[in-house]
Structures are given as structure tokens and as C-alpha cells.
Amino acid sequence: MNYLPQEDRSLDGSIGGILSAPWIPGIRKLADTDKDVKNALQACALAGLGWMNNDRTLVVRAAWFYAQALRQTYIALQDPVAALDDSVLACCRLLVLFEMLQRISSEPNTTDPRRNQIADWQMHVEGTCRLIQLRGRERHLTSLGMDLYDGIRLPAIIQGFSKRQPNAFTQLDWKLPSLNMRDRLYQLINPVPQLLQDFDLFLEHETRIHDDMESQHIAHGLTLLNTALSICYSLQAWEAEALNLCYEKQSSAGNDANPSNFVLGTAGEHNSLYGVCRLHGHGFFSTCTQYWTMCNILYGSLLAFHLQLQTFMNSWTPGEVLPLVPEWVTPELPAQNIARVAGHFLAPGMGLWAAHAAVFPVSNALWYFAKTGRRDSPAFKSMTEVFITSKTGVIMRDFLKAIGVMWPLES
């Protein structure tokens, strides 16, 4: 099975990107001349094939290639000059991928207590983020450098969201060329891990506020609230622009469509990203699901913060009321959208890539429905059913188990 999905060659990349993972072809070419990259690539390929086909021999072989690549990458990172080479960054990105492809058994008698899949994954992501920072902006302006930068961008943002704190990547203040709607989305969402950490620290400090500090604390809370609302409005504008691009492409293809059908929040088949997310290639589909996931996390955190800040103000400044959060800022709709399209990740032609692209949105939606007490809901069940029997779904299921998301299914 191919790792990358079968892309429509007619796509021009203006919406979501021509390739779902443009760094993969560059790494394949690099592997022709670099042994360490080749070892890392073989480790990923054998791990994926081994677990999908239940072939233990391939899995063991994959672990050997992984160990070789890991050792050589570690050696290269000790050299200030060698560490900056594209091949080292490529190896680091493949090691991140391997942690999603490997499968640590959940059986008590076979589980290695020294291994923690999510910790290993986060460690590789964090290290790769620091390497991006060390290499500097100029090394990511070449074609391969840009592809490698793109390859670590989403895992870095996901790691920041999952830990609710910034990492070396999300703290970068680089102005790289903005190529498409996916690039613009990631630029908008990049500050959110820092904002989530600020939310958490604000609430943590609430219990230690003295009488002479309440005004300063409230002012800081209002600043955070306004920052979050600004990002929300920017995300809404991004969605409207993406829908407009979809309409323009449909019109240029000769289809008669009413532009009013592409207005946010009204009824209609193609009035939202849900209606068009499967019409413009796998890259655009993945971008939409990542967008919903980020909105679900940001909107839910914002509403909780708004409630806590208002409660604090009621105690210290009775009568003062915060501005209302817009009705469309709700975590419910993004989670519902993910649930309704989750099966498309395992559609024919999606490749093994889909099992990895699905983990962040599906795990977040599963967690959301479990948290809100709806494990028996159709949305929850539809997501779990799509990867129970699929070969690529097996890898996604195992990684979900490894990061502790699957517990609601087994309780």
C-alpha cells in the first residue's frame, strides 16, 4: 500500500495543497543518496506493512532499521555542523512518523514497561522542533527545506495543543512565504498553544489574588479574552474565504451554484466546510478536519475561560458583565463535523497517510463526546466503527489506545 493518497493531478493547490504530505517525495529522493534517511524510511515502511499484515518478521526488521537511524541521527546531532544538514532533519521527521507506525501491544505480558508510545512521539516532535529552530529561517527557504518545515509543522502544532503549551516551533516568529489556505490556517492557529497555557495559568493564579491585585488580574483576563476572540474571528474569516474559493472552482468548472449557499450558518448541502470538504482533494479534506479540531479545542477552552472570568468578576466587581461570546463559538459543531466525515479517512485511495492524518481530529472528537457523556451517541459510534476492520484503521486504533483515548470504548 502507498503511504500517500492518490491525488487528483488537476488540483492546483490554491485551497489545500496538491500533496497531503509534500515532504514525503523529497525524503524519498534524499534516501537515494543518504543511508541514514534510507534506514529511517525503511523502518517506517516495514513497520506499517508489518502491523497491517500481522507479520512479526517485518516488525522486528523495522525495529532494527529504526535503531540504526536513531543512533546515527543522535551522533549527527552532536556535531554543530552536521546537525544542520537536511538529511538530519529528514531523519528526525521520519522518527516522529515511526512512533505512530510502530505498535506497542496492549497485552500485559507483551508490553515493554520501558516504552511509552506517546512519550516517545512527543520527545521526537519536541527534538525536531528544536532542530528547526537551530537551523534558522534561511535553511527552510529552499524547496526541500520548505517541504521539511511543512512536514513538522502539523505535528508540532498538535503537540502544542495536546500539552496546552508552546514548543520551540510554535514560538518561532518567522515570516515564511504563504502558499495556500493551509499555510494561512497554521499561521493563524500557531499562537493558540501559548494562549491555552495562559488560560490555565490565569485560572491557577486566581486563588492567590490579593485585594489590591484584582483589577490587574481582571485586566489581564480581558486581554486574554480579546486575544482569543480575535483569533476566533480570524478563523471564521479563513473559513469564509475557503468556501469562496470552493465556490469559484465550482463555477469555473461550469457548475451552476448559488453563492448564497456558501454562507456560514445557513442550511444547504454546500453551505459549510462539511459540505465541500471531500470535493477538493485529500489535502483539503485533512486541512478541514484539522481546522475543526483546533476550533473545538479553542472554542471549548474560551467558553470555560469566559465563565471562570465572569465568576471571578462577580466576586470582586459585582455588576460588571463581560461581553458575550458569539453563538457560533461552540465546540459542538466542529466535533459533529469530524464525526460525520471520519469514515472518509479510510476511503479507497487514501493510503496509509490517512490513518495518521485522522488521529488528531478523531481522538479529539472521541474525547469530546466522552467528556460530555455521549459515548452511546451515533456520532461516537460512527467514528469507532470506521477503523475497527480496516487495515489502515488498525494502526490508528492502536495509536489511539497508546495515547489513552480509547478507554471509553472498553469501559
For each feature predicted by the language model, list its residue ranges.
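Acidic, Ser/Thr/Pro-rich intrinsically disordered transcriptional activation regions
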Residues: M1-L58, R71, I75-L77
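Central/C-terminal regulatory/activation regions of fungal transcription factors
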Residues: L4-D12, S105, T111-Q310, V325-Q336
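Helix-boundary capping/turn motifs
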Residues: G16, T33-A43, R61-Y66, S87-R93, ...
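Fungal-biased detection of long, low-complexity, Ser/Thr-
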Residues: I18-I27, R56, V60, Q68-A82, ...
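Hydrophobic/aromatic-rich effector regions of fungal transcription factors
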Residues: R28, Q42-D55, Y66-Q117, E126-L134, ...
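Glycine- and acidic
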Residues: W51-N54, Q216-H217, G319-E320
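Residue-level recognition of alpha-helical structural elements
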Residues: L58, L84, Q117, H217-H220, ...
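Acidic, Ser/Thr-rich low-complexity linear motifs
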Residues: Q102-E107, H140-L144, M350-L352, F399-K401
